[in-house]
Amino acid sequence: MTGRLCLAGALIGVAGGLVTAFIEPAVGPDRYSYPYTPTGLVLAELTFILNHLLLLIGVLGLARSGAAGQGWLGRVGLWTSMVALVALTLCEVATIALADSAQPTPRTDTLGMAYGVASILIGVGLVLAGIAVARTRLWTGWARHIVLTSGIAVFVIVIPGVFSTFLAGRLVLVIWMLMFAALGLALIRSPHPATTR
C-alpha cells in the first residue's frame, strides 16, 4: 500500500510541476503566487501538500520494508528524510498565507530559506538511507540504488536547477518526482513486508 501511495504522490508531483512550468502566467514575477493567481496558488499548494504527505508515506514504507537494514545509518537517514518532508509540508502551508504577497519581502525570503534547508535535509537523509539500502542488498537491480540516486539528485540537479531559470527549476523537480515514482515501484515489488505494496 505504501508503494502505491508513494507512486501516486510522485505522479501528482510530476503533474503539478508540469502545470506550473507551462501554465500561462496570470501575474507578474514580482508576485509570490507567480505564475498563478493567489487563488490558483492556494489550489496548487494543496496538491503539493498532498504530494509531500504521500511521499512521506513512501519513506515510512521504506523504513518498514527493512531495505535499509537495522544499522544507525539507515535509521538516521530515514528519520532525517521524514522530519524534513514534514518541514517541507509546513513550508507549503506557510506559502498559502503569502498567496497575496509581493516578492521579494523579508517573509518570502525567510520562507525561501526554510524551503532550502528542508530540501537539503531531505537530500542528506536520502543519501544516508540510500547507502544503507545499497549495503543491505535486500533490494536488487535498479531498486538497490534508487534511494541513493534520489538523494544525490537533490545536490546535483535539484538545487542547481532551482537556482537557474523558473522553467528549469520546475523541470528538475519533475525529474526528482520521477525518482520518487521509481521508489514507489521498488516498494511495490519489495518482498518484505506486504504492507509496503
Sequence positions of predicted segments:
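Hydrophobic, aromatic-enriched alpha-helical segments typical of multi-pass transmembrane helices
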Residues: 1-197
